[in-house]
Amino acid sequence: NNIKESLNKNDGQLQNRVISATYPPGSVFKIAVLFAALENKVITNSTYYYNCTGSDQINDKEKLNCNNLAGHGIQTLGEVFANSCNPAFYDIAKKVGKDEIYKAIKTLHLDQKVDLGLDEEVNSNIPNEISLSNLSIGQGSLGITPIQINQMTQIIANNGLYKPLYIYDSIINSDMKQIKELTTSKEEELISPYTSTQIKQFMIGVAKTGTAKLLNDIDGGCGVKTGTAQSSVNNKEVTHGWITGFYPVENPKYAITVLIEGTEENSKSAIPMFKEICENIKPW
C-alpha cells in the first residue's frame, strides 16, 4: 500500500508502458517498409509478385523463415501484406534500400517522441547498425513505444496528414494562473494521399482475409496490421503480440494499438482485444 515505494520499484508494474517503454515492433513495422517502397515507386500494387517458398537465404549461414514454413506460393503485394510474409518483405527491403527505410522512419515520426506533454515519455531506439533482414520485419535492436506506433497508424488513417497528439493545452495552478503551456507541432502532410490510400486498402485486406481475419465481421470494418516480436526480458526470450489499426473504414475516427507483453503467439490475444475495443466505441 506504499504508493511511493511502488512507484520506485524496478519491476515496472506501475510504469506507463504506452509512452515510457520501447518494444521491438515486429511486423507492424512493415507499414513503414511498405510506405518507403510505394512512395519511392520501387514496387507497385499491379506489378509486384513474390513466390514464397517458406524461407529466404540471407547469407551462407543465415536464412529468414516465413510464418508459413510450407510457403505461401505466388502472392500479390496485397497478399504479401495480408499474410505478413517475411521473405517477401525482405525482398521489398532489398529493393528499396536501408537508407530509404530510415528516411521513412523519420517521415513517420518514429524517430522522435510523440510529445503528449508527459515528462515520462521516452523516445524510440533505432540504431544504424540493424541488418536489413531484421529491419525489414521490425526485429533486432529496434525499440519503439506503443504511442509512436499508434501515431504512425493515425497518419495513415488521416490520408497522410500528421496531426499532433496531446492531452492538454496548458496547466494552471489553484490561483488559475497558467504555469505551463504545451507547444505542439503544426499539421503537415507527410504521405501522399495516393500512397496512404493504398496502405489503408492493404490494412483493410489484413482484417478481411489476412492474419486478422477474425475481425472481418466488425460492424463498420477496420484496417489493421498484426505483429509478433521476439525480445529478451531478464535474460529470458519472450514474444510480444501487436495489432495496430483504424476504425471504422469509412472516415476513420479512431487509431487503436494493442500490445500484449511477453506471452503472445500470432497476436492471439491482441486481435480479440482490438475487436472488443471497436465494438465498445463504435460511433453509432
Residues covered by each model-derived region:
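Beta-lactam-recognizing serine transpeptidase/beta-lactamase-like catalytic domain environment
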Residues: 1-26, 32-260, 266
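Hydrophobic alpha-helical membrane-association signature
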Residues: 148, 270-273
